[in-house]
Regions:
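Membrane-interface helix termini and inter-helical loops of multi-pass transporters
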Residues: 92, 124-126, 234-244, 333-336
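Structural detector for short beta-strands of small beta-barrel domains
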Residues: 41-72, 110-111
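Hydrophobic secretory-pathway targeting helix
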Residues: 1-45
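Transmembrane alpha-helical segments that form the functional core of multipass membrane systems
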Residues: 141-145, 153-261, 265, 269
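Extended, hydrophilic extramembrane loops/domains of integral membrane proteins
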Residues: 97-133
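Hydrophobic alpha-helical transmembrane segments of multipass membrane transporters and ion channels
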Residues: 165, 185, 217-222, 255, ...
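Hydrophobic alpha-helical transmembrane segments of membrane transport and translocation systems
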Residues: 298, 302-305, 314-377
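Helical hairpin unit composed of two closely spaced alpha helices linked by a short loop
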Residues: 268, 277-323
């Protein structure tokens, strides 16, 4: 009997190892293929083999009065696809040191180029942008490898949930283009995302049900708070300058960002409290409701400050590229705070309130679901 169990267990381990070895081999093949997939593109791709860079002059920005240096690059690149494969071309590229509207290129960069052809001869070439697919594939492969090494099957399920979220996001974009409210689409997709992610990772059980209900309630309250803040303040104190080029209403995008940005933190809080209280009840079903509530509050206190900071940096990270560009081009800190930080702070504060409310809801829902499991006789 023991030998039979041992063989079954050994066979299961062997199958698991074979599965992960096959997965890693597929990822490796994918990386190698992406590094050599230029033949798949219709656009001309070239690899930079040499650069000669020259300083031209300093120029003054008329808007802010700051100076920036201008450089010219004489680039030699070898074409990697199309009928002109293996031809060496020369490209001139001018860029500003601030790199707001221009780009500096480096040796070994792969770029898309447009060619000016006259009588089957290349007269001139112009760089259109980077070829970035290899970086995406390498990062994705690295992410899958690390998440499966650390999380095993749950790590793989987490990655599947990420794919599901990307799919939901594309659905939101598609139906929003058809005229459906962005707020409604974001809210519904957030609820679906929450349900799918938690069920995939934690299975369908009481703690998952508790976390799903708590997350949905937390998201609903967060969305309502966002709507109330916008309508009461009448947009006073909220600067939407960074959204001025958008063709969609600012309100919908702002609230959708809060819903999507707060989803991860709210889910994390909900499953943390639900799992922790579940563990406490399983270890000691004699615990009183008062002690259980106190334990839930203590857990909430431990994670609240961390999650609010995570939420703040989640929102602020979207503005970092613009902040860096503006700093490099001499724009004052006060202007940056007015244009960017105030909006991100509003998002973080609303999200923080949502997190705090989710803690209370999670404790209440978990106790309600596990009430029968408590033995107070």
């Amino acid at each position: 009997m023991n030998n039979g169990c041992y063989l079954v267990k050994k066979n299961k381990i062997t199958k698991t190892k074979f599965f992960y070895a096959t997965l890693y081999l597929i990822l490796l093949i994918g990386i190698v293929f992406t590094l050599n997939n230029s033949f798949l593109y219709k656009k001309t791709i070239a690899k930079i083999i040499a650069i000669d860079e020259t300083y031209i002059k300093d120029t003054e920005d008329g808007n802010y009065g700051c100076k920036t240096a201008i450089y010219e690059q004489n680039i030699k690149a070898i074409i990697k696809n199309t009928q002109y494969k293996d031809r060496v071309i020369t490209i001139k590229n001018t860029y500003h040191k601030g790199e707001v509207y221009t780009q500096r290129y480096h040796k070994n960069d792969e770029v898309f180029v447009s060619l000016n052809i006259t009588k089957d001869d290349i007269k001139k070439a112009h760089i259109e942008g980077y070829k970035r697919d290899k970086y995406i594939v390498i990062l994705t492969s690295l992410f899958i490898i690390i998440i499966t090494i650390i999380g095993k099957s749950k790590g793989l399920l987490s990655f599947i949930s990420v794919i599901a979220n990307i799919f939901l996001f594309n659905i939101v974009i598609y139906f929003n283009a058809k005229g459906i409210s962005l707020i409604l689409l974001s809210f519904v997709s957030a609820l679906l995302s929450c349900t799918i992610c938690l069920t995939l990772v934690s299975g369908f059980n009481k703690k998952t049900i508790s976390a799903i209900i708590s997350s949905c309630c937390g998201l609903t309250i967060t969305m309502l708070i966002s709507l109330i803040v916008i309508h009461i303040s009448n947009y006073n104190g909220l600067r939407f300058d960074q959204m001025e080029l958008l063709t969609r209403p600012y309100e919908g995008i702002f609230i959708s960002e809060i819903i999507m940005g707060g989803l991860g933190a709210i889910m994390d809080i909900a499953i943390t409290i639900s799992s922790s209280l579940n563990e406490i009840i399983e270890k000691n079903n004699q615990i009183t409701l008062k002690e259980l509530i106190t334990s839930g509050k203590n857990i909430g206190r431990d994670v609240t400050s961390t999650m609010i900071n995570v939420l703040f940096f989640t929102y602020i990270c979207g503005a970092i590229p613009n902040l860096v560009l503006y700093f490099k081009n001499g724009i004052s800190i006060s202007s940056l705070i007015n244009e960017f930080i105030s909006l991100e702070m509003a998002r973080a504060l609303i999200g923080g309130i949502g997190i705090c409310i989710t803690i209370i809801i999670s404790i209440f829902i978990t106790i309600l679901l596990y009430k029968r499991s408590l033995n107070h006789e």
